[in-house]
C-alpha cells in the first residue's frame, strides 16, 4: 500500500503554485544567511561584488523593498571572463530557482525585440507568444539573466523600464505577466576596453572608475535610475587564477571519475597551467582553453583509444617546460 508523505505534497503544491519546492516547506532564512559564503565558495576574486549582491537580496527579502517591483534589478559591470554570468548561475542554484537566460546579441535589430513579448496581431508569429513573457509565465520565481545588455536594441530598454518599475509586462495578447518574484540581472562589458588601456602619467591609479563613465554614456538616466545596484566586477589577479585552476582540476576529476580514471597533478604542473592561462584582460576563459588544449585533448585520445580505455591513473607533471603524462592501467597492476 502506497502512502503519500509530506515531501510528495510539497512537490505537488510547488508544481501547482510554480514555486521552488524548497520554498514550500522551509523558510529561506538559512539560505539567505549562508548566501554570501556559498557564492564565494564557487566564484573567486569577486568578494566585493558578491557582498553587494547578497546585501541587496537580503534587503529585498527582509520586506524593505517596494512590493510591486521585482526582487531586485542589478547591473553587473566589468571585464570579460571574471564571473558575472557565473554569479547569476550560482545564485539561481543556491536559491533553488530557475535560471532564465537571454543573450542580448540576438536582439540587436528592432524587429527582433518583438520576439521577446510576441508579435502584434496581423504579423507573422502572432500565434507563437513571446520568449520572455512565456518563460516568466512558466517560471515566475527565477533569476532572469540578460547577458551583454549593451548589445540590445534601444527599444528593449523601454520595455524593461516598466518591468523594473512596476514588476509587470503585457504581452501581445494583452495578458499581464508578473515579474515581482524575479531577480533581474543584466551584465555589461561597458568600460572594460577603457579599463584595459594603460593610463598615462599620474592617472595610472584612477582607471577603476572609468566603467562608471562608460555606463553613464551607454545607459539613459531613467534606466540607471531604476537599478537597485550597479555591481562592479574586478579583473582576476594571479593569486585568484591559481584558485580557478584548482576549480577546473576538481571538475576534471569528477568527469574522469565517471570513466574510472584517477588524476594526480603536481604543483609545478598547476603553476604551469596558471601562468600559461593568465591574461588580466580576459579573465578565466583563456585558462579554460589552456586546460582543454593541453590537458583534456591528450586525455581524450587515451580515454578513447589508448591506455585509459578501461580506467586507470594519470599523473601530470612538467618535463622540458611542457606537461608530461604518465599513465598507469590499474587493471594490469591488480592482476599482476
Predicted ranges, named:
Residues 1-336:
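AAA+ P-loop NTPase nucleotide-binding core of proteostasis motors
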Amino acid at each position: 500500500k502506497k502512502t503519500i508523505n509530506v515531501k510528495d505534497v510539497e512537490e505537488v503544491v510547488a508544481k501547482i503554485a510554480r514555486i521552488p519546492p524548497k520554498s514550500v516547506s522551509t523558510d529561506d532564512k538559512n539560505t539567505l544567511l549562508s548566501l554570501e559564503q556559498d557564492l564565494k565558495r564557487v566564484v573567486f576574486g569577486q568578494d566585493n561584488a558578491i557582498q553587494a549582491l547578497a546585501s541587496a537580496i537580503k534587503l529585498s527579502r527582509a520586506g524593505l523593498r517596494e512590493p510591486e517591483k521585482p526582487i531586485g534589478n542589478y547591473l553587473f559591470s566589468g571585464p570579460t571572463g571574471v564571473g558575472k554570468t557565473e554569479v547569476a548561475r550560482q545564485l539561481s542554484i543556491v536559491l533553488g530557482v530557475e535560471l532564465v537566460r537571454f543573450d542580448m546579441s540576438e536582439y540587436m535589430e528592432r524587429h527582433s525585440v518583438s520576439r521577446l513579448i510576441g508579435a502584434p496581431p496581423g504579423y507573422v508569429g502572432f500565434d507563437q507568444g513571446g520568449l520572455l513573457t512565456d518563460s516568466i509565465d512558466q517560471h515566475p520565481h527565477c533569476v532572469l539573466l540578460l547577458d551583454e545588455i549593451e548589445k540590445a536594441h534601444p527599444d528593449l530598454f523601454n520595455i524593461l523600464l516598466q518591468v523594473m518599475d512596476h514588476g509587470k509586462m503585457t504581452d501581445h495578447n494583452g495578458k499581464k505577466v508578473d515579474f515581482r518574484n524575479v531577480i533581474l540581472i543584466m551584465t555589461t562589458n561597458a568600460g572594460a576596453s577603457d579599463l584595459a588601456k594603460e593610463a598615462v602619467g599620474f592617472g595610472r591609479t584612477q582607471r577603476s572608475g572609468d566603467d562608471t563613465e562608460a555606463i553613464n554614456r551607454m545607459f539613459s538616466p531613467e534606466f540607471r535610475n531604476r537599478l537597485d545596484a550597479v555591481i562592479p566586477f574586478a579583473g582576476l589577479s594571479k593569486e585568484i587564477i591559481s584558485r580557478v585552476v584548482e576549480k577546473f582540476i576538481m571538475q576534471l576529476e569528477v568527469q574522469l571519475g565517471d570513466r574510472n580514471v584517477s588524476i594526480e597533478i603536481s604543483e609545478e604542473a598547476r603553476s604551469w597551467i596558471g601562468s600559461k592561462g593568465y591574461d588580466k584582460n580576459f579573465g578565466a576563459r583563456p585558462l579554460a582553453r589552456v586546460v582543454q588544449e593541453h590537458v583534456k585533448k591528450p586525455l581524450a585520445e587515451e580515454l578513447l583509444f589508448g591506455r585509459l580505455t578501461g580506467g586507470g591513473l594519470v599523473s601530470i607533471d612538467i618535463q622540458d617546460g611542457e606537461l608530461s603524462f604518465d599513465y598507469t592501467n590499474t587493471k594490469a597492476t591488480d592482476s599482476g
